[in-house]
Swiss-Prot record:
Name this protein carries in UniProt: Transcriptional adapter 1
InterPro entries, sorted: Hfi1/Tada1
Compartments in which it is found: Nucleus
Keyword vocabulary terms for this entry: Nucleus, Transcription, Transcription regulation
Disulfide bonds: none
Gene encoding the protein: TADA1
GO terms of biological process kind: positive regulation of DNA-templated transcription; regulation of DNA repair; regulation of RNA splicing; regulation of transcription by RNA polymerase II
Compositionally biased residues, Basic residues: 94-103
Gene Ontology molecular function, alphabetical: transcription coactivator activity
Length: 335
């Protein structure tokens, strides 16, 4: 692993020296490529514009070092993922070998003013294959947590933007745990709005969706729930072989459960439908501390509202008429 880190730092240093003042623009383009805002071809074209012809190889070496560091196996066809670099070819392409033929002035004039197609130098448009969407590694597409290699790649780019040289394994592990705990906090806020729960130590929520509900007309029920033994008593000097964090005795726990069941109501709570976007929207509005950053909070609220939108009958009818017109142009008939 140390070898890969040294290779990455050496490749980054060589690339920074080759870029010079254009290093900030290169990191910005690299970030856009990681976010799937631009394609690999567009990123290579921008790198080719920022680098000289003799320093293009530093761009390829840097990308190869990142992929090796993140342990991502990428299989690309030959010549599709790298920029051309004419290493030691001193001869100019296109010049035929042999003696030059003398041409008249008229031939030179006609050759110079031949009409050209202005679209010949434009970039060729390539239709995107729907199967290429499988290459996207965003959480919103895969519906899964990002892998350790993906997080490390994003962290390396962010570190370079802030002037850092490397990302340690401990930092990657901390981000992985932070993502998991952040999602658990969001799920806890959603479930706590739908189901009853109990509190331990005044802040820890547990026992979600318990079927035992207190009877509000019985005075015993309030006392039973308030005097609930949630944690074992703290021993100042535990005896030898005694675990201070042990659970209450089985007889006490059974007696406590029987008392709660006797003080509960006769009817069970109604079953709820699965969690939907409305529950998430309400939970984030009530528990705003779950997402403390205002920018991230506002962006996710907008995305939730967009998901909740659905077309009305007039828009559905207009869409149907539009599809029928398109089908009529193509010679098809929609039922």
């Amino acid at each position: 692993m140390a070898t890969f880190v040294s290779e990455l730092e050496a490749a980054k240093k060589n690339l920074s020296e080759a870029l010079g003042d254009n290093v900030k623009q290169y990191w910005a383009n690299l970030k856009l490529w990681f976010k799937q805002k631009i394609s690999k071809e567009e990123f290579d074209l921008e790198a080719h514009r920022l680098l000289t012809q003799d320093n293009v190889h530093s761009h390829n070496d840097f990308l190869l070092a990142i992929l090796t560091r993140c342990q991502i196996l990428v299989s690309t066809p030959d010549g599709a993922g790298s920029l051309p670099w004419p290493g030691g070819s001193a001869a100019k392409p296109g010049k035929p070998k042999g003696k030059k033929k003398l041409s008249s002035v008229r031939q030179k004039f006609d050759h110079r003013f031949q009409p050209q197609n202005p679209l010949s130098g434009a970039q060729q448009f390539v239709a995107k294959d729907p199967q290429d969407d499988d290459d996207l590694k965003l959480c919103s597409h895969t519906m899964m947590l990002p892998t350790r290699g993906q997080l490390e790649g994003r962290m390396i780019v962010t570190a370079y933007e802030h002037g850092l040289d490397n990302v340690t394994e401990e930092a990657v592990s901390a981000v992985v745990y932070a993502v998991e705990n952040h999602l658990k906090d969001i799920l806890t806020s959603v479930v706590s709005r739908r189901k009853a729960y109990r509190l331990r130590d005044g802040h820890f929520k547990y026992a979600f969706g318990s079927n035992v509900t207190p009877q509000p007309y019985l005075k015993n029920s309030v006392v039973a729930y308030n005097n609930l033994i949630e944690s074992p008593p703290a021993f100042t000097a535990p005896c030898a072989g005694q675990n201070p964090a042990s659970h209450p005795p089985p007889d006490d726990a059974e007696q406590q459960a029987a008392l709660l069941l006797a003080c509960s109501g006769d009817t069970l709570p109604a079953s709820l439908p699965p969690v939907n976007m409305y529950d998430l929207f309400e939970a984030l509005q009530v528990h705003r501390e779950v997402i403390p950053t205002h920018t991230v909070y506002a962006l996710n609220i907008e995305r939730i509202i967009t998901k909740l939108w659905h077309p009305n009958h007039e828009e559905l009818q207009q869409d149907k008429v539009h599809r029928q017109r398109l089908a009529a142009k193509e010679g098809l008939l929609l039922c």
